[in-house]
């Protein structure tokens, strides 16, 4: 091989090395950008999921309140009905008074029917909204890899997946309940997180549940990479 051919060969090798290093650097920048975008997406979706969960809790409380109101109305109407029937028995034979009392009973029945219909309509509307919220929660669950289950002991179990890139289906979980002091109580964390107690105290003070979920997920991710 002559000197000119050797020089041309060395030049080709250098050009190939420069192109390879440039592409490697460019690909690394793209990967880092995608990683940051993914983290932002996860954080935003976690916050939306928290809002949906809070709305579900409010809807459940409203439905319970409506049911309690209906029970109270039923009891009140029954008491009034009993009183009216007692009065009818006392004035039996007095046609005019009986007619008045009968009209009162009819009014009470109509009032009860109206209130029952109002509460029933509100319950149906709330149930439909809960279905929509559950559908949204399922969508966020699929995107975030987060599943929420109700387990014995009045607890909710939060199960994260897509944490470990090598094993996306591997579950990372913890349980949550409300103690007698009306505070969040976190337990049964797997794998164990040293920082979980700190996260628990913070969510008790701030009541920012979406931030709590985001912090726990980040801690699980960090544990995998460490």
From Swiss-Prot:
Residue segments, region Interaction with the N-terminus of SPBC24: 1-146
Quaternary data: Component of the NDC80 complex, which consists of NDC80/HEC1, CDCA1, SPBC24 and SPBC25. The NDC80 complex is formed by two subcomplexes composed of NDC80/HEC1-CDCA1 and SPBC24-SPBC25. Each subcomplex is formed by parallel interactions through the coiled-coil domains of individual subunits. Formation of a tetrameric complex is mediated by interactions between the C-terminal regions of both subunits of the NDC80/HEC1-CDCA1 subcomplex and the N-terminal regions of both subunits of the SPBC24-SPBC25 complex.
Positions of the UniProt region annotated as Interaction with the C-terminus of SPBC24: 147-226
One Pfam match: Spindle_Spc25
Gene: Spc25
Protein location: Nucleus; Chromosome, Centromere, Kinetochore
Organism: Rattus norvegicus
Protein family per UniProt: Belongs to the SPC25 family.
CDD domains associated with the record: RWD_Spc25 (cd23784)
InterPro entries, sorted: Spc25, Spc25_C
Keyword terms: Cell cycle, Cell division, Centromere, Chromosome, Coiled coil, Kinetochore, Mitosis, Nucleus, Phosphoprotein
Subcellular location, principal: nucleus
GO biological process: attachment of spindle microtubules to kinetochore; cell division; chromosome segregation; mitotic spindle organization
Region (Interaction with the NDC80-NUF2 subcomplex): 1-58
Coiled-coil features, chain-numbered ranges: 89-147
Role noted for this protein: Acts as a component of the essential kinetochore-associated NDC80 complex, which is required for chromosome segregation and spindle checkpoint activity. Required for kinetochore integrity and the organization of stable microtubule binding sites in the outer plate of the kinetochore. The NDC80 complex synergistically enhances the affinity of the SKA1 complex for microtubules and may allow the NDC80 complex to track depolymerizing microtubules.
Positions carrying Phosphoserine: 12
Protein name: Kinetochore protein Spc25
GO cellular component, as recorded: cytosol; kinetochore; Ndc80 complex; nucleus; outer kinetochore
Lineage: Eukaryota, Metazoa, Chordata, Craniata, Vertebrata
């Amino acid at each position: 091989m002559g000197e000119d051919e050797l020089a041309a060969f060395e030049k080709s090798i250098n050009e190939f090395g420069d192109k390879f290093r440039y592409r490697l650097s460019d690909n690394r920048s793209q990967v880092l950008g995608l990683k940051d975008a993914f983290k932002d997406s996860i954080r935003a979706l976690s916050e939306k999921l928290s809002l949906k969960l809070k709305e579900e809790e409010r809807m459940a409380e409203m439905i319970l309140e409506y049911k309690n109101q209906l029970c109270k109305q039923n009891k009140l109407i029954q008491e009034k009905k009993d009183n009216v029937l007692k009065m009818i028995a006392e004035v039996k034979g007095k046609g005019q008074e009986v007619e008045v009392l009968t009209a009162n009973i009819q009014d009470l029945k109509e009032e009860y029917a109206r209130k029952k219909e109002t509460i029933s309509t509100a319950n149906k509307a709330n149930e439909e909204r809960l279905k929509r919220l559950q559908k949204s929660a399922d969508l966020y669950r699929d995107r975030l890899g987060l599943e929420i289950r109700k387990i014995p002991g009045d607890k909710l179990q939060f199960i994260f997946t897509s944490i470990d890139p090598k094993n996306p289906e591997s579950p990372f979980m913890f349980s949550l309940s409300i103690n007698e002091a009306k505070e969040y109580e976190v337990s049964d964390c797997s794998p164990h997180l040293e920082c979980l107690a700190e996260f628990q105290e913070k969510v008790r003070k701030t009541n920012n549940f979406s931030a709590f979920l985001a912090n726990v997920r980040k801690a699980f991710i960090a544990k995998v990479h460490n």
